[in-house]
């Protein structure tokens, strides 16, 4: 069983949902980022979704774009991100780790080389945000060749064919987007048809569903679980804590610890 499958089975047995924070690797620096990620795991994160710093992220709202810029300004490359992942994996052998990336970033390194490096540093799954199902083949092949689980996004306006494709091709988990638009902690609305989408994904035997976009409050975690999702992903709200404490690292870690504990408590 993969780390994601093992974790979901463990959570199911305890009747808990998953809380998964997202942060950008090397934000604001390599060392601070390592301590941030350790804080997330030590305070109850069930899995990690991590981004590589990139100058042109399509789905990211201003908060995560700023995180990308901080890491890039600090001079961090994709190889630094891989080294950081390696450090995280050696400290936490069990935690499921997924990457959320743009295709250009993978392309720059070459598909095969990128997924091989992911395997070497202990990444479990990769979600390429801007690859439609129709263009998935090369990415899925490269991922599977190196034992990496490909993850796909189910958008709120998905038709039956898309739902079926996402369910069939996703491994590890399924990313259900709460609403159209870019990521944001401010816009906490979600599409009215999410419960139907969850039902349809499950009818097609999709892997466990994690709902993301606009998850900033414990009540929204509860809501995602009530809709039938296996858990919730929180990116902008997590990164915002880093952004507002750039000049006080200890305060940043303390606030992140409290945030993760509160969000995790909502899954029980």
Curated annotation (Swiss-Prot):
One of its GO terms (molecular function) is tryptophan synthase activity. PROSITE patterns: TRP_SYNTHASE_ALPHA (PS00167). The active site is at residues 49, 60. It is an enzyme of class 4 (lyase). It catalyses: (1S,2R)-1-C-(indol-3-yl)glycerol 3-phosphate + L-serine = D-glyceraldehyde 3-phosphate + L-tryptophan + H2O. CDD domains: Tryptophan_synthase_alpha. Pathway: Amino-acid biosynthesis; L-tryptophan biosynthesis; L-tryptophan from chorismate: step 5/5. It comes from the Bacteria. One of its GO terms (cellular component) is cytosol. The alpha subunit is responsible for the aldol cleavage of indoleglycerol phosphate to indole and glyceraldehyde 3-phosphate. Belongs to the TrpA family. This is Tryptophan synthase alpha chain. It comes from Haemophilus influenzae (strain 86-028NP). The lineage of its organism: Bacteria, Pseudomonadati, Pseudomonadota, Gammaproteobacteria, Pasteurellales.
């Amino acid at each position: 069983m993969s780390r994601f499958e093992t974790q979901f089975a463990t959570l199911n047995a305890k009747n808990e949902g998953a809380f998964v924070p997202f942060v950008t690797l090397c934000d604001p620096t390599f060392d601070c980022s390592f301590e941030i990620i350790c804080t997330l795991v030590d305070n109850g994160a069930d899995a990690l979704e991590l981004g590589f710093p990139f100058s042109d992220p399509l789905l990211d709202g201003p908060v995560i774009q700023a995180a990308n810029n901080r890491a890039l300004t600090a001079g961090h490359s994709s190889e630094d991100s891989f080294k950081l992942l390696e450090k995280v994996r050696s400290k936490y052998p069990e935690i499921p780790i997924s990457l959320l990336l743009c295709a250009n970033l993978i392309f720059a390194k070459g598909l095969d080389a990128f997924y091989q490096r992911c395997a070497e540093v202990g990444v479990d799954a990769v979600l390429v945000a801007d690859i439609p199902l129709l263009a998935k083949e090369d990415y899925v092949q490269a991922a599977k060749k190196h034992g990496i689980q490909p993850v796909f996004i189910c958008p709120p306006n998905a038709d039956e064919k898309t739902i079926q494709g996402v369910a069939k091709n996703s491994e590890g988990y399924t990313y259900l987007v709460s609403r159209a638009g870019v990521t944001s902690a401010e816009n906490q609305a979600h599409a009215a048809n999410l419960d139907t989408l969850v039902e349809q994904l499950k009818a097609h035997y999709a892997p466990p569903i994690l709902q993301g976009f606009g998850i900033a409050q414990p009540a929204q975690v509860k809501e995602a679980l009530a809709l039938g999702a296996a858990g919730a992903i929180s990116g902008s709200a997590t990164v915002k804590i880093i952004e507002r404490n750039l000049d006080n690292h200890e305060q940043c870690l303390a606030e992140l610890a409290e945030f993760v504990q509160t969000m995790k408590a909502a899954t029980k």
